A protein has these predicted regions:
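A hydrophobic, multi-pass inner-membrane permease signature
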Residues: 2-287
Length: 287
């Protein structure tokens, strides 16, 4: 038997498989990245050049930044970005505080009816979001919190899914650490902040990033609860650009605003992508 021939055939098959894999990954990458490329390209085209194209061009020979100037001057986009930042930071901080305490209670504390209460919590995930939005809107309106940051923030300060995810991570920490801490007269809160949170930091960071993305991209709730420009978020800004006339006509300027809004989230993901993967991996591992 010619082992060298067999080895060459195996290497050839491996090389062909690798080429096919790279081609498929390249095609998938193009499909994923093309919408963002098109958005950036359109934002760099002048109004006249964009409307003169009968067939949209995949490049531009005369890029311009005027659309970005229009995005900030036609509407107070800077103020909307600041409002979104305030909403995102406060909401995320409050949610992390709430879900951390709730997850710790379900994971480590013993109290009557714990399993029943947790089951009821999980059952809330079965309720359609549309019903929750209606209930939240009615409640916030009755409390006279429309057009306030408090009205924007309150419905988003907890998440059953994140409580469940963090509880599962807390339960992966050996019980011996908890018992040893109790022997040393360590309080539950001190054990939580000194032991559990540092160990489960990757998952907590992942939750923070996912919540930041969720808040930054909020669309339905801000439109329902605010009709005062003082409390508009970036999603309201995009809608305002379209409604005030130039957004419908001047697509390049609207794309420029979308690029500005998207860049912070893209940078956030690129910076913390390893921690996100670590948190997801830990969340899917038992023991």
């Amino acid at each position: 038997m010619d082992y060298q021939l067999l080895e060459r055939k195996a290497q050839r098959r491996k090389r062909i498989s690798r080429i096919v894999l790279y081609v498929l990954l390249t095609l998938w990458g193009i499909i994923v990245l093309f919408p963002f490329y098109w958005m950036v390209l359109t934002s760099l085209k002048s109004y006249g050049a964009y409307n003169a194209e009968y067939i949209p061009a995949l490049y531009t020979l005369s890029p311009t930044l005027k659309n970005y100037v229009d995005a900030f001057t036609q509407v107070p986009l800077g103020q909307y970005l600041l409002n979104t930042l305030i909403f995102t930071v406060i909401t995320t901080a409050l949610m992390i505080f709430v879900i951390t305490l709730a997850a710790f209670a379900f994971a480590r504390l013993e109290f009557r009816g714990k399993n029943v209460v947790f089951t009821l919590f999980l059952s809330l995930m079965m309720i359609p979001n549309e019903l929750v939005v209606i209930t939240n809107f009615t409640t916030i309106t009755n409390l006279d919190l429309r057009n306030t940051f408090l009205g924007l923030i309150l419905p988003s300060v907890t998440s059953v899914f994140y409580i469940y995810l963090l509880k599962e991570n807390f339960e992966q920490v050996p019980n011996e650490l908890y018992y040893a801490a109790k022997v040393d007269a360590t309080s539950d809160l001190k054990y939580l902040f000194k032991v559990l949170i540092p160990i489960c930091r990757p998952t907590i960071i992942t939750i923070i990033i996912l919540k930041v993305i969720e808040c930054w991209n909020s669309y339905v709730w801000p439109h329902l609860i605010t009709d005062n420009e003082k409390y508009y978020l970036v999603s309201n800004g995009i809608q305002e650009i379209r409604e005030n006339g130039f957004g419908r006509e001047n697509i390049p300027a609207m794309m420029a605003a979308v690029v500005v809004i998207s860049v912070p989230l893209i940078l956030l993901f690129l910076i913390f992508r390893k921690k996100i993967m670590a948190g997801v991996s830990r969340g899917g591992t038992k023991g």
